[in-house]
C-alpha cells in the first residue's frame, strides 16, 4: 500500500491499472480527460500492459469496448456528459450483449446552455440503459470501485456492464488522501476475466443476434435478472474486499445516523459527505438528522430505502439533475419505492448543484431546517437569482 | 481529540501556479505525518493565462467531507499584489506578495517576487508564498513541504523550489 495525494481521476486511473484491463478505448472529454491521459501514460511507460486505442468518438469508444469484451478480455472506457449521450446508442448493446465493461463517467452538465461543470444530468438520463450505476463519494471509494466493479460485473450471475460515476470536478479534480493498494493484493482479489460469452474459434457461438417477438422478452428478462443478481453479489465481494484491503463498504446504500433519524436527506455522490457533516453538527443541538446515501442507482436498492426511511418524519431527496416536466430522477424512484412500504414521511425534492453550482454547508443546513415543516414540493437551490 | 481544521484560499493569475501551491501544501500536510488529511482543488473551469484564479486547500486532523469552496478562510494568500483588495480580511490572515507594508490588521506582506527572481530567475511566487504560509501552520515545516514538492513538481524543479521555500519559511519564522 502506498499513501498518495491525488485527484479522483488519478485515483481511478490507479485502480484501473491495478485491475489490468487488456484494452482501454476512450475519447477525451472534460472533466474525464485526466483518467484517460494517466492510463495512456501508464501504457506508454510500460506500467500497464494494455492496448490503448485512440478512437474518433465516444460512439466508437463504446463500440470498440464491446468488440474487445466480445473477444473475451477485460475492458475499460471512460466518458462524460455529451460523450455519454453520444455513446448512448451503444450502452444497451453492451448491456444486452452481457459484456461486463467497466466505464468511469465524470458526471457533468448536459447542453444547452453549454457547461463543462459537474452535475448528474448525464448519467441519470441513462438509468434504463441496462448498466449498473454506482455513485462514488470520495477518491478512495472511486479507486476501490475501479477494482471492485470488475468483480461484480464479471460475476457469471451478473454479466452486466458497470458505470462508476464520479462527480465532475468536485471529485474528479479534487486532490485528497488515497491509499493505493499493491498489485499482489489486487491480483489475489480480482482473478483474470474468463467467460464463455466470447468469439471463440474452438467453440463458436452466435453473438449479437436478432430475437423477434417470440423470444425477445426472454432475453430482456434475463438481462433484468442479471442486473438484480448484483444485489446478492455486492455484499460478499465487499466482505472479501474488507479482508484483503481493510476497508469496509456498506452495500447498496450507506446510512448515517439513521437508527433514530426523523429528518433525513437522501442523496448520492460526493455531496453526501457534506450532508453527513451537517447531520453531525445538528445532532450536537439535539436535532435527529440523518443521511441516506444511494451508492447504487441500478440495481435500485428499494428494500434498503424502505427499511432506512421507515421511521423518518420528513425526507428530502437532494440531487443534481431534473427530469424536465416531472422532478429529479432519484426523487421519483425513492417515492416509488416508498409506496405501500408503511412509511408515512413527507418527502420533498431539492435540485442543487446544476451546472457546477457550489453546494455549501449552509445550503444543507437550510434543507434540514426546512424539513421541520414537512415540505412536499420540488424546488431548486439557487433558483432565485441573487 | 477535537478536529483541527485550517482553510486556505490562494489568489493568483492563470500561470502563476496557485493551484500547484494549493496541492503542494495539501500533499505536504497529508503525506507528512499520520492522521493528517487534506483536500486541494482549483476554482474549476477553463484555464486562461493571466485571468484571476483561486485555489483552495483544507487541512484537518480528521477526514474531510466538505468539498465546497472556502468562504471563511484562515489564510488568504495573494501571489499577485494586484489581486489584494487593500483592506483587512473579513476572516483570518492575508499573506500578500508585496514589498509594501500595508499597515492593516491581519495583513502580512512578504516580497516574494524579489526572492523568486533572485533564486529561481523568474517572478513565479507560488512556492515562496507556500513557504511563507508554512511558517504560520503546524505541520507545514520545510521537511513536510519537501514531501509536498516531491509529490507535485517534476524532478528538475524540485531542488530550487524547495530552497526558495525554506528561505521564505526561515525569513518569516525569524520575524514572528
Report residues per predicted region:
Chain B
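Active-site cofactor/cluster-binding pocket
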Residues: 1-176
Amino acid at each position: 500500500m502506498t499513501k498518495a495525494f491525488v485527484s479522483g481521476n488519478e485515483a481511478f486511473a490507479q485502480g484501473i491499472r491495478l485491475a489490468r484491463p487488456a484494452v482501454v478505448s476512450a475519447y477525451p472529454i472534460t472533466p474525464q480527460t485526466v483518467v484517460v491521459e494517466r492510463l495512456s501514460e501508464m501504457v506508454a511507460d510500460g506500467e500497464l500492459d494494455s492496448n490503448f486505442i485512440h478512437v474518433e468518438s465516444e460512439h466508437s469508444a463504446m463500440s470498440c469496448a464491446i468488440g474487445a469484451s466480445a473477444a473475451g478480455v477485460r475492458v475499460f472506457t471512460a466518458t462524460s456528459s455529451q460523450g455519454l449521450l453520444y455513446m448512448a446508442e451503444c450502452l444497451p448493446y453492451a448491456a444486452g450483449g452481457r459484456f461486463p465493461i467497466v466505464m468511469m463517467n465524470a458526471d457533468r452538465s448536459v447542453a444547452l446552455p453549454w457547461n463543462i461543470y459537474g452535475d448528474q444530468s448525464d448519467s441519470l438520463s441513462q438509468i434504463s440503459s441496462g448498466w449498473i450505476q454506482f455513485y462514488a463519494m470520495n477518491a478512495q471509494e472511486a479507486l476501490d470501485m475501479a477494482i471492485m466493479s470488475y468483480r461484480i460485473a464479471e460475476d457469471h450471475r451478473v454479466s452486466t456492464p458497470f458505470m462508476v460515476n464520479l462527480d465532475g470536478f468536485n471529485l474528479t479534480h479534487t486532490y485528497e488522501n488515497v491509499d493505493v493498494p499493491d498489485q499482489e493484493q489486487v491480483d489475489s482479489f480480482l482473478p483474470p476475466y474468463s467467460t464463455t460469452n466470447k468469439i471463440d474459434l474452438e467453440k463458436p457461438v452466435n453473438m449479437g443476434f436478432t430475437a423477434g417477438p417470440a423470444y425477445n422478452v426472454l432475453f430482456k428478462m434475463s438481462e433484468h435478472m442479471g442486473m438484480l443478481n448484483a444485489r446478492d453479489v455486492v455484499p460478499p465481494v465487499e466482505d472479501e474486499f474488507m479482508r484483503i484491503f481493510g476497508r469496509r463498504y456498506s452495500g447498496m446504500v450507506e446510512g448515517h445516523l439513521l437508527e433514530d433519524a426523523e429528518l433525513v436527506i437522501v442523496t448520492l455522490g460526493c455531496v453526501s459527505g457534506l450532508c453527513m457533516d451537517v447531520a453531525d453538527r445538528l445532532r450536537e443541538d439535539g436535532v435527529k438528522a440523518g443521511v441516506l446515501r444511494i451508492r447504487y442507482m441500478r440495481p435500485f436498492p428499494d428494500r434498503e430505502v424502505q427499511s432506512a426511511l421507515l421511521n423518518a418524519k420528513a425526507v428530502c431527496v437532494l440531487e443534481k439533475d431534473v427530469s424536465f416536466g416531472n422532478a429529479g430522477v432519484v426523487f421519483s424512484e425513492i417515492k416509488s419505492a416508498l409506496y405501500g412500504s408503511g412509511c408515512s414521511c413527507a418527502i420533498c425534492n431539492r435540485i442543487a448543484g446544476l451546472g457546477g453550482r457550489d453546494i455549501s454547508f449552509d445550503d444543507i443546513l437550510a434543507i434540514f431546517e426546512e424539513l421541520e415543516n414537512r415540505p412536499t414540493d420540488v424546488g431548486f437551490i439557487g433558483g432565485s437569482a441573487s | 481529540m477535537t478536529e483541527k481544521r485550517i482553510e486556505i484560499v490562494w489568489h493568483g493569475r492563470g500561470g502563476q501556479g496557485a493551484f500547484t501551491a494549493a496541492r503542494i501544501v495539501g500533499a505536504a500536510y497529508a503525506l507528512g505525518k499520520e492522521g493528517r488529511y487534506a483536500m486541494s482543488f482549483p476554482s474549476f473551469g477553463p484555464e486562461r493565462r493571466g485571468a484571476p484564479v483561486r485555489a483552495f486547500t483544507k487541512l484537518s486532523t480528521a477526514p474531510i467531507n466538505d468539498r465546497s469552496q472556502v468562504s471563511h478562510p484562515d489564510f488568504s494568500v495573494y501571489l499577485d499584489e494586484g489581486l489584494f483588495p487593500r483592506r483587512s480580511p473579513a476572516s483570518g490572515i492575508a499573506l500578500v506578495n508585496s514589498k509594501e507594508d500595508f499597515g492593516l490588521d491581519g495583513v502580512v506582506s512578504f516580497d516574494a517576487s524579489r526572492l523568486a527572481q533572485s533564486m529561481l530567475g523568474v517572478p513565479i511566487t507560488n512556492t515562496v508564498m507556500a513557504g511563507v504560509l508554512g511558517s504560520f501552520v503546524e505541520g507545514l515545516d520545510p521537511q513536510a513541504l519537501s514531501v509536498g514538492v516531491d509529490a507535485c513538481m517534476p524532478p528538475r524543479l524540485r531542488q530550487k523550489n524547495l530552497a526558495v521555500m525554506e528561505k521564505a519559511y526561515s525569513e518569516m519564522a525569524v520575524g514572528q
